[in-house]
Amino acid sequence: MTDRWDPSIPEHKHLAHQIEIGNGIPEMRPIQKARDALVNVGFEILHEEDLAERPDEVPWYYPLEGDVFKAQTVWDIFTCWRTSSSGKFVSHHGLKLLETFGVVPKGTWDVCETLKIAGDALVKTGQQKLFTPMYLVISKKPLEG
């Protein structure tokens, strides 16, 4: 979670929880904890950057938004459509039908619903810059001397 994430704000905490549940992550931690951990074990941080903050016309979460107009390639059109309202409707109801007839294992639809929660939370936190999958840190461990 970025430095903008504040666990005292209920919406922020709820969105982090949705990411945790949907992606099987035990606990989302803020970037500051990563910084502190590096320093505590003796690393010197040479450079750190949230690459998602760089100016780009298309955000990292675009495939999860469901906006086919942000597609970068022909295959992206299908990828983006799957997360659109109509794509979610077709895929989730189609999957429920396949599960009903035993084509896919029981519980597949439930997993899909959980992933949908995570995807929606990733989009919201990406738009609000509360979460980043693109935190870059370059550090070095000083030589003992």
Report residues per predicted region.
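Conserved beta-strand signature within the Rossmann-like core of class I S-adenosyl-L-methionine
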Residues: 1-4
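Substrate-binding/catalytic lobe of Class I Rossmann-like enzymes that use SAM or dcSAM, i.e.
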Residues: 8-134, 138-145
